Amino acid sequence: MSKPPPKPVKPGQVKVFRALYTFEPRTPDELYFEEGDIIYITDMSDTNWWKGTSKGRTGLIPSNYVAEQAESIDNPLHEAAKRGNLSWLRECLDNRVGVNGLDKAGSTALYWACHGGHKDIVEMLFTQPNIELNQQNKLGDTALHAAAWKGYADIVQLLLAKGARTDLRNIEKKLAFDMATNAACASLLKKKQGTDAVRTLSNAEDYLDDEDSD
């Protein structure tokens, strides 16, 4: 009876390491990597041999080598987003690193991309179908709060076009509009809030009209 095929790894369950030393394979199945390479571990079901990918190549790595000779990267997508490193971010996504993972502050990679003003990173993250726009971190801030506070009107515009909520308050009870540090951001947010308010009022009037017609 043949072994069942391994289950595909779920996004977010990928472990990421940076190699501290070069590893020379002894068999064709093993993965070659050099010092400084990023390794994405996708299968740890065998305690001795883990399956990993580096630079687009996939192979086996002795688990003890990874444990002893590699440095764990806890939030690679966040690191790529903070640095504005588009190629690393794309590599993380290609290797199924979870797009909505939270760091110790409760922030997403999208939050850090907006905080740093990295428009190309934001656009790349927006290509992910399950991207969470409105995640609030431990301070209650969303990606929209970060973009408004840092004064990146182009990113505020992107977030609003994607459907980011303007009515979420952080733990200081501040909306993204309250955090805006320049007129361009404030204007975009005020306009969107006004549109949303009109839409809500219109919906309420429709509801009342329906009741009247009963």
From Swiss-Prot:
Subunit architecture: Interacts with SRC and SMN1. Interacts with FASLG.
Keyword terms, alphabetized: Acetylation, ANK repeat, Cytoplasm, Phosphoprotein, Repeat, SH3 domain
Modified residues (Phosphothreonine): 200
Organism of origin: Homo sapiens
Expression sites by tissue: Ubiquitously expressed. Present in osteoclasts (at protein level).
Residue span, SH3 domain: 12-71
Source organism phylogeny: Eukaryota, Metazoa, Chordata, Craniata, Vertebrata
Protein name per Swiss-Prot or TrEMBL: Osteoclast-stimulating factor 1
Positions carrying Phosphoserine: 202, 213
Gene Ontology MF annotations: SH3 domain binding
Keyword Phosphoprotein applies: yes
Residue positions where N-acetylserine is found in the record: 2
InterPro entries per the UniProt record, alphabetical: Ankyrin_rpt (IPR002110), Ankyrin_rpt-contain_sf (IPR036770), SH3-like_dom_sf (IPR036028), SH3_domain (IPR001452)
ANK repeat ranges, renumbered to this chain: 72-101, 105-135, 139-168
